[in-house]
């Protein structure tokens, strides 16, 4: 049943024992998304008071944080509150920030689907680009420049048509989508506020990161869901776009820790977060099928290519040109050596483990709820 944002009672003792402790209050945009839900969990475990901004909709999409929202007693200390708001509404952002007075803001909210950004270019620019400016301006309006730390979810899509391999903090940007271009504006306005107003503001240039909580319209989750359905006999075949696109894939749970570490750093700096390993969409498909005991062999070329099950002879994968982007990003590989050195961060979950976790989770999900 949908329920409106409201404060959850906390198990934290708010008596004299808390006096003298520094305030740990986080505000997260995009809290209902993959990264936001993992970050909320992470911060609650660290004793933060967590506030999230959610958009009003007829279907209240809090599925990824429902376990936190309903049962805050599971945490030793800390609590959570959700607020209606939108990155396109300056007034509500000022109101929420002034009320919450956060010590850390994590801007994860975005129209984050690259392919869809070609169809919703203006909206993507408004939310992902100008929305970041609205948040930064709200911090300034509320007089919190000297008391808040700001994390901006930047993206490897900034590199687009890559200018060097691997990509690091100093690699020139060349975005290849409205999403990448909007995020480029957000990146530079964060740098500008840091330099102009001395705001502790950082960009986390995160390469692709996945999990069982990944949105169903992203390629990795589309693969894991489809493979699970094939395993359960609910589906025979699914279509993909560019099988040879290569990405640096990590686990979202590892990457939210890096976000937090950036705000605990002595100085505000931008960091690339990645695994340094590259795998193709084709490999993701092959690994996924391996976890259900099937071997995929490829036949044909380009849009006529198919993935056939070696054991049964059935075609399970086809290529559809409609899933190609107008301008493709063929290869992304991150160099996170700066984060390893300065933040002592490194990825924990290996590619094979990530794929297995996603397929297993979707097998369980599709078994209990085929229409999920």
Curated annotation (Swiss-Prot):
InterPro entries: GDP_Man_deHydtase, NAD(P)-bd_dom, NAD(P)-bd_dom_sf. Coiled coil: none annotated. It is an enzyme of class 4 (lyase). NADP(+) binds at residues 30-35, 55-58, 86-87, 108-112, 123, 183, 209, 214. GO terms for cellular component: cytosol. Residues 1-22 are annotated as: Disordered. GO terms for biological process: 'de novo' GDP-L-fucose biosynthetic process; GDP-mannose metabolic process; Notch signaling pathway. PANTHER family: GDP-MANNOSE 4,6 DEHYDRATASE (PTHR43715:SF1), GDP-MANNOSE 4,6-DEHYDRATASE (PTHR43715). Belongs to the NAD(P)-dependent epimerase/dehydratase family. GDP-mannose 4,6-dehydratase subfamily. This is GDP-mannose 4,6 dehydratase. It comes from Cricetulus griseus. The lineage of its organism: Eukaryota, Metazoa, Chordata, Craniata, Vertebrata.
């Amino acid at each position: 049943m949908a329920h409106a944002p409201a404060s959850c009672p906390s198990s934290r003792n708010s008596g004299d024992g808390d006096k003298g402790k520094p305030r740990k209050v986080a505000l997260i945009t995009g809290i209902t998304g993959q990264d936001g839900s993992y970050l909320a969990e992470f911060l609650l475990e660290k004793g933060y008071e967590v506030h999230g901004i959610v958009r009003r909709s007829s279907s209240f999409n809090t599925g990824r944080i429902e376990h936190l929202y309903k049962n805050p007693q599971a945490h030793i200390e800390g609590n959570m509150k959700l607020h209606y708001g939108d990155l396109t509404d300056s007034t509500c952002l000022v109101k929420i920030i002034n009320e919450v007075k956060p010590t850390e803001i994590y801007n994860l909210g975005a129209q984050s689907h690259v392919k869809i950004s070609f169809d919703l270019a203006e909206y993507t620019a408004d939310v992902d680009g100008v929305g970041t400016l609205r948040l930064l301006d709200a911090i300034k309006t509320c007089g919190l420049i000297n008391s808040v730390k700001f994390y901006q979810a930047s993206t490897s899509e900034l590199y687009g048509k890559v200018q060097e391999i691997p990509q690091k903090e100093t690699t020139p940007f060349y975005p290849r989508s409205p999403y990448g271009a909007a995020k480029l504006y957000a990146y530079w306005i964060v740098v500008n506020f840091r330099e102009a107003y001395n705001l502790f503001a950082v960009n986390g240039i995160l390469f692709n990161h996945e999990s069982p909580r990944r949105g169903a319209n992203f390629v990795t989750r589309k693969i894991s869901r489809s493979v699970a359905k094939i395993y359960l006999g609910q589906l025979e075949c699914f279509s993909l776009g560019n099988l040879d696109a290569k990405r640096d894939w990590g686990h979202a749970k590892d990457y939210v820790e890096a976000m937090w570490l950036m705000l605990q750093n002595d100085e505000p700096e931008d960091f690339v977060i990645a695994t340094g390993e590259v795998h193709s969409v084709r490999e993701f498909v092959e690994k996924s099928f391996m976890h259900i005991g099937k071997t995929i062999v490829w036949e044909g070329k380009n849009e006529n290519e198919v993935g056939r099950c070696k054991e049964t002879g059935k075609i399970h994968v086809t290529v559809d040109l409609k899933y190609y982007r107008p301008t493709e990003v063929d290869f992304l590989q991150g160099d996170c050596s700066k984060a390893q050195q300065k933040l002592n961060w490194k990825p924990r979950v290996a590619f094979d483990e990530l794929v297995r976790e996603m397929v297993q989770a979707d097998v369980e999900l599709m078994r209990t709820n085929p229409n999920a």
